[in-house]
Amino acid sequence: MNCRRKPLPLHSNEVQAAESISKDELYSWTLKNVLILFLVQYRASTPSALQTSSFSTPVEKKTNGAFSGSLFSAKEKKDNPKYPKDFIKYLSLALESISMGKEPEYQDQLIRGCFAAFYNNINKSHISKQLKDSRKIEDMFLIFASSVSSELTKRLGTAYDSNLADRITASFIELCKRVTLKGQLASPSSEFVSHLDMYHSKLLNKSEILSTKRVNRGQDQFDLSSFPLLKVFSSVFKVAYSKALLDAEKLFPSIDEAAIAEDIGILIEDLESDACKFSHSVVDFSNYKSYSTWKARELQTLEQHRKIMLSLIPLSSSPNHPIQPIGFPASRKTPTYVPPIARPYFRQLLSLCLEYRLQVTDPVEVKQINTFIRECSIYWRILPSTRCALSMDFAREHLQKGLITSADVLTHFGELHKSLKEWEITYWPKIDVSIFSSALFGIRNALAQLLKKSLLDLLHEKKADFHRWLNIMSICVEDGKVINQDLSPKSEISSVALALQEHCKVIFDEEFDLSKLPSSNFLDEIILASNRISVRIKFLERNCSECIYGVLSLPQIFINIVLPNYIRAALVVAKEYLREKANADINDLTKDMLEIYSDLKQMIHVLQEYHNEEYRIGSFEGFFQPFIDSWLDNVEASAEQWFLRSLEKDNFDENSSEGQYSSSIVDLFHAFHQAFRTLEGFEWEDDLANARFFTRFFRVIYIVLSKYTQWTTQKFFEEANKQDDTSEVQNDNSSSWFSKARNILSGSNEVLPFRFSPTMCILLNNIHFAMHAYEELEQKIDLQRLIEALDVAESTKRHKISATNYLYTIKVVRGEGLHPDGAGKIRTSYIVLTDNKGRRIGKTRPIHSMNPRWDDTFEVKTKDALMITANLWSKGKFNDHEIFGRSSFTLSPKIYGDYLPREEWFDLNPHGELLLRIEMEGEREHIGFYVGRTYHDLERAQREMIKFIVNKMEPVINQNLSTATLKKLLSANTWMDLDKTMTSVTSLLNRTGFSSKSSENVKKEGELTDVQIEAAIYELLDYFDLNFSIIAKHLTKDVFVTVMSYVWDEVVCTTEELLLPPVSVKPINRKPLSPAQMAIVYRWLQFLKDYFYANGEGVKLPVLETDHYKELLRVQEYYDKPTDFLLQECDKIASQLYLSSRMVNNEPVESLPRHSRIKFANKEIYRSGTIRKVHIQTNESELERNERIILRILRMRADSKRFLSKHFQRKGRLLMADAMRNGYVMPLGHLKKLDSR
């Protein structure tokens, strides 16, 4: 293929060529194209459509114009709409502009003169007043008709053509419509605009523009005014329609069908011969396939056009243009109606059309413009790709100049996508692809600038719809993929982000720089500025929350620039304020400074949220730390008032609004939570400082709750003493002196039942409520994190045992082998603990027994070693007390430094032994300690109250579950009236609801029935009924279950004492129970378990079936076994336990450093956080339980003394070895004591 033409010029050259085309030349070529379109449509239509049926009738010339009739009669319709209120104002401005020649569409001198005459008339006062009052469009049209008539008479004389006046009036109506729509005075569908269209239509129908203006060519007459594209043509070129019509009438006779067909033939010949003078060549395409595809389509289209034109040629063709036979070469070498190079002409024409389309609002007219563009491109053989590429290029240009809206841009893209479906971009010429690519890049860059403008408006809190530009940008990016171009706007968006950053700096300097805001109160400055910044951030987050293309986040840009600068400026202002107030009290400044801290802290949180990491600004927290300390000082000073005010308002009424607890504890925790929310709101980021703050706060709570528990416990026992005194008075009144004397002489201890008051229950409920409320408060903080922060800070400090306070907990468990009095009677004994200075530490309750079990706990706080003396006192019947035993022991960190609890037997001089359980804990300025001690105090108070309740029940329990009761039950002479017993038992069964075997179910002769066994303890069950009903009514459900579990544990312990002595190395002079006695004891245990369970309505089985209870049930397995069997079993168990211990300690602890071994064994409360986590007790293994049972049974066997001594010596050595493996060396005196045993 030999192409004899160079490739199409570059885009820039094409633009220059288009700009060099004169408007008149373009006007001429375009008018030819319009007339060709008219001729084609005329020939293709039916003869009746556009051609007159008879041409012999002469046109009658009218001397009177349209205004002489009733076209604009004011009486035509009384309810004609009035023109809008500001219509005359906008119309006057348009008329003034036309009169001065500023409007290119109205350059005709006659039109300008007529419009100027009308403009002068309506500015006259009387006419202006008339129009203002009536606002009727008919009045205005009559005034305009008079003005036109006068002006035309003055210029043309009285013989002017009336059609000229009609055309001028039609132009005026069009002007009125344009002014209305452009000024948005009325909608296109309004009644006023409809009336304008109606008058315009009537005027045209009456005028001779449509009826008499004809063009003659041969025997045919043509009406060019009926062609709508001619009107579009006049508007595009901004000439009067009358002028365009006259030019068309002059040019139309030269338009010939044969010449048109010949032009098409020239184009076909040019394409087939590859001359490429008037069409594209192969060099214009990226590959030959694209060119051949285009060429085939183009030839097919041109052949169709030529056939159509030949079919439209009339039989009598023009003599000037004879029909050229098909297949013969054309007589001309250049087309007559097609420009030599059509692309520049079409580009210039498209520019005019698009500019005019921007001014049009009527959709019908917009559609006509699009049709005009398409039809012109068809005959000039402009490809759809060229039309789309140039259209996108003009869209880029108009967008950069701000001439079009987002809707207009979307219209261009819609036309593009429609064209791409018809003509794939693969077959586009290279020049069109280049233009299209440049247009997309330009549109993308323009969109970035428009996006920047919208975002700037958002920074100033102005509404801006930037999403429309983003949507168009996404369309542009997708279209770029069609031409294999990466139009990702990330770099442009990054540039926009940098510009926005600079603008944010300006915003800070102008609006939020506190140093430039003059004010007398710096606090007001900071608070107001903080509020404005918060409002601005919320506005940005609400209107522009997304991150644009992963590059630009408007809120983050604003926050990153403004907030750090603002915080620094605020700190500078705050420091300046503190320098001015250097002599003021810090407490007076605390409130203001904490308000500033809260505002600035909120700003920092916003920064951290957008950075997803900690954001620190210098020593921000360090600057405000003294004011946090001052606030904590105020809290500590107010704590005493919290305590006192809470007690002043509390009446401890059981009918209070709080329910089963009183108002004092509720008020206290309300104050705690209020202060806690303030401290938590500080959100201190420095873990160590935050841990110290919370340590101080929880120390305050510890102090207040410690006082409250002491006061509550004291009031509880005062209330109990009142009840105790009342019971004694009632007993004194009911008992005879003879009964008292008999008890004294017999040595028996009379049991006085105790009645519990509702106030005691409310006090116990308060303590339980405090425990749960404190637990909820503790769970709101990350206690473990605070503990770790304090531990890490103190890890470098050298561990010194003597540098801290220590808390010793001494539990007086029980006594054994106590000596009777001189008469051989059992003593009522108690223990009093004193220190080396004679100060009393504590006193146990008196118990009437040779082997009393006190289980009373006391606490001693000291730094140094302390000698404790335990004095055993005897309480006489006549309040005469005497000491009959004494033992001493030392409390020292050197002995109890492993922080493990120890149970030790101490000899009571001269007779008996005392079992103590001693445990040491550390006390430090540590949040873990205060939290743990608070739990400890609350639980201790609750335990003491519950223990008091159990202790009051204990004598009744011991009196009924005793060897005396067993002996009486098994004696031959029954000690109770059977009828009375049966009546009481039947009543008891009806009350409790648990079933037992009936009295008719009698066992073998001589054996006791279940009814008789139950009847022996009916007084105990009656006592339980009376007191449990009171505490169940006034205690909360959880506390009631706890009390019942304690009572049940007392029942189990009492039953255990009937069966076994405690573990000890020394034998005991005690005989085991007989099989019958043991059976009765276990029947009692089962009866009481059923009583507490109450068919599922009482205490749940998991609470009743404790390990202690299960261990008691296993006593039956070994109780009657021979001594040799028990000795062998004990040795076997000891060996197994030794092997198990070696396996557990396979990894020795001595491999750890010294401080780690101490920490490993440490049982301090603060190391585990809460008293609930201090020491998790594991269930004793079955082997250890069996060993303990066997050792207790062996104490009652006379021939086991030597075995017990050796067994405990061996066990002591094993304990010493374990302690040494754990890195702790026991004191020598302690080891000697173990060996002596």
Swiss-Prot record:
MHD1 domain boundaries: 591-712
InterPro entries attached to this UniProt entry: C2_dom, C2_domain_sf, Glucose_resp_signaling, MUN_dom, Munc13_1, Munc13_dom-2
The protein's name in its UniProt record: Uncharacterized protein C11E3.02c
GO molecular function, one term: phosphatidylserine binding
Listed GO CC annotations: cell division site; cell tip; cleavage furrow leading edge; cytosol
Domain C2 residue range list: 786-906
One of the protein's GO biological processes: exocytosis
Classification of source organism: Eukaryota, Fungi, Dikarya, Ascomycota, Taphrinomycotina
Annotated ranges, domain MHD2: 1014-1130
